[in-house]
Amino acid sequence: GHLLVEALVARGIDTVFGVPGESYLAVLDGLHEHRDRIRFIACRHAGGAAFMAEAQGKLTGWPGVCFVTRGPGASNAAIGLHTACQDSTPMILFVGQVASDQRDREAFQELDYRQVFGPGTLGMAKWVGEVHEASRLPEYVARAFHTAMQGRPGPVVLVLPEDMLTTATPAPVLPSIQVAQAWPAPGALIELRRLLLQARQPFVIVGGSGWTAE
């Protein structure tokens, strides 16, 4: 859990949102340990926490981070995840999961999150990953940030089995990603300018992601 928190801090995350749950107690312990560098905003409902993370991502252009527990925590966060997908907002939803040795045994509130949030949902998340080796946790976090930011921004779900958060590992925190900025081709901008100048009553709807001060 501490390794995950350190990976978030290394990527410039100073605020995360969530509803505390027993499925990711090790992360909460890490957040408390590093409370001078990262703030955990405890919410009363997972849907509200997801919306806060979505707003954070939308306003900053860097992934908003939300932690929820398994089962109802994840399902309640779905509305915020869907909003992030529809609005092209970078966001990462971390979901607690039953321990690996309890999978497929009808453990308490166990769900298959690749089925819940995966491609078959048509607009819920860009990628759903689940950590199966504690030593690969930094790799999964790095991929989550990369996927959320590259191309069309959007939400990512990373599932955290309990034992993956409590297993000691010497794995180092991976460096932060460098996001490639997408720009229109010069020819397309010239054509856009020509069309606007020719228009008698130009009307522009400005929205979506990727807008900066420049």
Where are these regions (language model features)?
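N-terminal alpha/beta PP-like core and its mobile active-site loop of ThDP/TPP-dependent enzymes
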Residues: 1-214
